[in-house]
């Protein structure tokens, strides 16, 4: 015989202690290390860890990401794969630099660092990245995220930097690296270029009120081109006086740097007479401009012509003195080769008449499109604002660019140039690290020509499985569609130095390795720190010219996007032959799976994709999960200033890391925003973790009492129907969880698991409870073996989701000193599947569920027996199943009789009314017709459609309304003395009339529940027999006397007496009871 006992478990577990014990076992047994060294028959499953920056503390959103990162590697390991879980740290970039600048008091200073300052600055950066490393390690371990932190890749290490250099040289060899002049976003306080990714995040943009001004630029008649002269020839002398171009802008601070005015050559333009003077505008803007002067007559059109007729027309700039002050020209309206140098009209297809005046103010130093136009016309740039955002000209000189608007507007008003001034609410980007408004600024920098491979990046994107799927052609696809060249240079200190050495004549040498640089420099540099300022000291001579490194460092997104290669220190020589890291790289490229927050579509996901496409013509990853952001329960972003930040570790201590992980998987689809509250974590714990634990503790308690011989259990085919049903459901669950996880659908997998555990607890154990009580000295080995197997398999299925709980269950249930995470993933045993059996049981459970809902809705206590219930099934097959399970239905619904209805019945009457919050605005004046249509509709048919979640149509007065389930409210009414409901084709209708006998039985059942609670309060074991004394009166006494045998059997009372007694006394409805253990 194979009898065994299980370690006793508490009914109320301390999950914090349980998880601590499991963590210790993992350490003692080196469980994670075993997954890295044991044979992997299914081969390598490649996972990339997106590198966090360790100089900030981990937060709740890191728990979300790490839960999803951990889930699928655990699953794949159990399927027989090897998963290398190499950790990584992103150690360069602005987050690190800004934290050090704050310590040094550098933030906002507008001059560079000396060599000594730079050396100290980078030393502090190197150490600061590890300030919170212990917090990260503690979080990683505490939540059960398995990661190799003993040998992580670190982006500041020489091997990583050198590998990144190697990639850049390869891209240069492909003709994809170039130096160019472009308008880039800057954070003024740090005067450094920002990437598109850093501005692509939702939080980078804020709704702000900015100026909206229309400014007059008087045209210069003396130099008017012939074509423009002809276009304006119909104007009288008086009408020509003060004629101006009218430009519109929301950035008055750029007006001192104005160099051009742009019009669309194909649009119609007019001279319009207005209260503020005669102006040239697009004809499509006339009505909009007329509305600006509310009390004035509409603008009068005096002449009409095409935009192309205005080319080369000169105008008076809004700030005439600036061009000469900045040294761009020596005098106003300077001409070269017969053409104006500045301040004339140019042609631009991007100008429209949809907003503004149809005449665009151009300040090419601060606008990408403006810069392209200036290049086309050979116009020099004017920098009225420097790269720290400080105005350099006008009486507003020295002010921050956004602060200068008010004074500039007042000055132009005083000089009669202001046509109209107001405000406009729109989105504007801010730097999330400094809080500064972004300054778009033309500057020379280094770029990767990603625009040349834009089509290939789109093609490679088609090969990637995105979760959620709409990201592929939505957020990520749109980002690829809008691809611009990648600005990779940063005017900063702490970062991967660009490996670009230039000669005095501009010749470029891109270095691909330390060995190459050593050879050129004529000395061994293998021990050199490759960061500034040391790398800046390295020069070499070629063909008689000295080469020095350019001062910029690399965009950190290129750093992190290089991790598939640089984590192994991959190096190729100039012939493309492997020098280092090729074997590991080939084994771990591309990734099978990556996961980060949705903002990484414009960050890490993009940099991985771009680099991989350019170098290898394939995606860097096959499957990717994009996670929505976590906000507080009000939908607000979590921040220290709002006081709504939730620290992860106290949350783990209170609810257990498993409960928090389960919440992360189940709260919403992965790409959706998650509104977090502790209440929802508590609910996740209650609904799944506690439910599973309760079944587990129930099994252990009774198995230790009965000590069943599990090996002696009958074959599955010979077990009772309830056991065969549970094992069939178990196989369905194995199938469904496996399929979901294979599809990277954690939530569906969790739902399948949660549904099974609910069935296990609230149906199988509930219906089989008496089989575990060992009445008459018999032990139901079939029941024990069935429940034991179900729990054992569930412990394996839940292992990737809730790794601590799973291991605790498995170790005790299996009797093995081995982790569940080292066991093979369950496979479906097809012979146990039984669609008919599970469908039949589902029909019974549906009726019971519907019946319980009716009881709850009508305040009919579950323990109060009712005379009968009428039941209608959704199909003939379901009806047969219900009839076979009549006894179960009676017991579950606590009724004396069941009547089965066949065919339709009018027992429940329905009426319909519009759901006004949903359809009110949509139908407006048609609401009376809609109400009539609902009154005349087949209410039962509509109710059926609504219950099924299907749309439907109703008609009245020749109007058809196509409605959704949420468009109507369905009111149900049953006859007097009947409580009923319908759903999905099922009907349950209770007879609510109560006889004295039924009332007494209900009271007896309530008394049983009260005595059971008293047993628990007294600390009795479930098997303890008791003597029971009942001090009752009235109806309670009558009920106890009538149902004495039933009460005694339920509460294990071998002696029942009336009156006072000795022992544990408890108050109950109708009196008191006293319990004494025998």
Curated annotation (Swiss-Prot):
Entry keywords, A to Z: Aminoacyl-tRNA synthetase, ATP-binding, Cytoplasm, Ligase, Metal-binding, Nucleotide-binding, Protein biosynthesis, Zinc
Primary residence: cytoplasm
MF (Gene Ontology): aminoacyl-tRNA deacylase activity; ATP binding; isoleucine-tRNA ligase activity; tRNA binding; zinc ion binding
Entries under InterPro entries matching the protein: aa-tRNA-synth_Ia, Anticodon_Ile_ABEc, Ile-tRNA-ligase, Ile-tRNA-ligase_type2, M/V/L/I-tRNA-synth_anticd-bd, Rossmann-like_a/b/a_fold, tRNAsynth_Ia_anticodon-bd, Val/Leu/Ile-tRNA-synth_edit
Localization in the cell: Cytoplasm
One GO CC term, this protein: cytoplasm
EC number assigned by the record: 6.1.1.5
Renumbered ranges of motif 'KMSKS' region: 637-641
Binding site for ATP: 640
Gene Ontology biological process terms, A to Z: isoleucyl-tRNA aminoacylation
A Pfam family annotated for this UniProt entry: tRNA-synt_1
The keyword Metal-binding appears for this protein: yes
Role, per record: Catalyzes the attachment of isoleucine to tRNA(Ile). As IleRS can inadvertently accommodate and process structurally similar amino acids such as valine, to avoid such errors it has two additional distinct tRNA(Ile)-dependent editing activities. One activity is designated as 'pretransfer' editing and involves the hydrolysis of activated Val-AMP. The other activity is designated 'posttransfer' editing and involves deacylation of mischarged Val-tRNA(Ile).
PANTHER family: ISOLEUCINE--TRNA LIGASE, CYTOPLASMIC, SOLEUCYL-TRNA SYNTHETASE
Domain notes: IleRS has two distinct active sites: one for aminoacylation and one for editing. The misactivated valine is translocated from the active site to the editing site, which sterically excludes the correctly activated isoleucine. The single editing site contains two valyl binding pockets, one specific for each substrate (Val-AMP or Val-tRNA(Ile)).
Family: Belongs to the class-I aminoacyl-tRNA synthetase family. IleS type 2 subfamily.
Quaternary organization: Monomer.
Protein name, UniProt field: Isoleucine--tRNA ligase
Organism encoding this protein: Deinococcus radiodurans (strain ATCC 13939 / DSM 20539 / JCM 16871 / CCUG 27074 / LMG 4051 / NBRC 15346 / NCIMB 9279 / VKM B-1422 / R1)
Classification lineage: Bacteria, Thermotogati, Deinococcota, Deinococci, Deinococcales
